[in-house]
């Protein structure tokens, strides 16, 4: 019931952002990031497209062709790498007019940036070991239950992953976190 109340409240708090009003430490945050289903080995291009469509919906001017997952895939895909290299994700976002920061992230980094309305591209290793690397978009957190919500281009929108499982999958990629904010956004 509390979740339903919080979801309804999100409509009145700020478009696409959910947080409990005065005591946000008790609830969490959820960003309404559009979901894009990936093609085979297309998690990187789908993740970029989700991120760009989110920022476009929040007032950033982005050419439609730059937000098209298929066009991104054709431009960046590496046959050798069976996907898109992180450095190519970063370059593409810079070329599209974003300030880009690739970090070795921590749980608190997720909380900080999601609370500020900034979705994040993360690299995980589903299952935690020996699976192919996979990009997802972090879209929210449940602070009470210590869980992260992701748009997983292979599995669906707003998937909830418990912290222990998530950190195992994320640590397998050395906690790769990609923060991309419009160049026109104020620096914080």
Regions found by a protein language model. Give the residues of each.
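Active-site-adjacent structural segments surrounding the nucleophilic cysteine of cysteine proteases
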Residues: 2-6, 10-81, 126-129, 144, ...
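Mid-length scaffold segments of soluble, non-membrane domains
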Residues: 72-120
């Amino acid at each position: 019931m509390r979740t339903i109340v919080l979801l309804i409240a999100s409509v009145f708090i700020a478009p696409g952002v959910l947080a409990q009003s005065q005591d946000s430490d008790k609830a969490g945050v959820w960003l309404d990031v559009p979901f894009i289903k990936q093609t085979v080995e297309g998690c990187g291009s789908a993740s970029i497209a989700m991120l760009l469509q989110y920022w476009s919906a929040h007032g950033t001017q982005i050419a439609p062709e730059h937000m098209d997952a298929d066009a991104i895939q054709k431009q960046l895909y590496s046959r050798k790498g069976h996907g898109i290299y992180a450095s190519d994700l970063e370059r593409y976002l810079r070329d599209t007019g974003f300030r880009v920061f690739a970090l070795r992230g921590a749980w608190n980094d997720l909380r900080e940036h999601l609370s500020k309305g900034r979705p994040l591209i993360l690299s995980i290793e589903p299952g935690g070991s020996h699976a192919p690397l996979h990009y997802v978009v972090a879209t929210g957190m449940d602070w009470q239950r210590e869980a992260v919500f992701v748009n997983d281009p292979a599995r669906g929108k707003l998937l909830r992953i418990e912290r222990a499982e998530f950190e195992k999958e994320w640590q397998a990629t050395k906690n790769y976190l990609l923060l991309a904010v419009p160049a026109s956004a104020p620096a914080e």
